[in-house]
């Protein structure tokens, strides 16, 4: 039986005693996702890598390519340094039209908890708006994440963005 103030989240055959998370931690993780989306929506790309551990994995793939393995990823970065390099490249690129993104994150759930790591999943939808044009649906999919919990701070250890469509977007510049 969970302690008063704790909520049990059980998934994937995980034993109940390992699935007990405090409501406060769950709210912290939801806030972490909200701040992640806010950072990207606000165009603060220089801050994006700060959501990750130094040794991390960031991938964007399709549902089909996820089954085929990392070699088929649309984007694959293996460190925070690689993320900063990508941000610099975006700033220097002249091959894309600047635009805004607006993330909607929903269906958030913690799938597993062990030690100082959580496995979480959430759905996302991103709208894209070019200057003087209407907003359009850009991509949708799910985040499949491993989140490190240490010293009261959360960081992504692994973030896999799985696009619903097997057809890759024509322009995948900004982080998802």
Residue ranges and their predicted role:
Residues 2-42, 46, 50-54, 61:
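Short, low-complexity N-terminal intrinsically disordered segments enriched in polar/charged residues
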Residues 21-24, 71, 135:
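Conserved aromatic-histidine-acidic binding/catalytic patches
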Residues 36, 48, 83, 120, ...:
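Hydrophobic pocket/interface hotspot
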């Amino acid at each position: 039986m969970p302690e008063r103030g704790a909520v049990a989240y059980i998934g994937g055959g995980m034993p109940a005693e390992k699935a007990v998370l405090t409501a406060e931690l769950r709210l912290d993780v939801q806030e972490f996702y909200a701040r992640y989306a806010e950072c990207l929506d606000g165009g603060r790309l220089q801050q994006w890598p700060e959501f990750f551990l130094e040794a991390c994995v960031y991938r964007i793939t399709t549902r089909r390519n996820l089954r085929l393995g990392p070699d088929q990823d649309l984007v694959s970065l293996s460190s925070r340094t690689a993320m900063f390099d990508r941000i610099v490249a975006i700033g220097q690129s002249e091959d894309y039209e600047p635009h805004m993104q607006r993330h909607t994150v929903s269906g958030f759930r913690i799938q597993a908890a062990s030690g100082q790591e959580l496995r979480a999943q959430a759905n996302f939808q991103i709208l894209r708006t070019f200057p003087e044009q209407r907003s359009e649906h850009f991509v949708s999919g799910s985040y499949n994440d491993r989140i490190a919990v240490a010293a009261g701070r959360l960081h992504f250890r692994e973030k896999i963005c799985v696009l619903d469509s097997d057809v890759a977007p024509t322009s995948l510049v900004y982080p998802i």
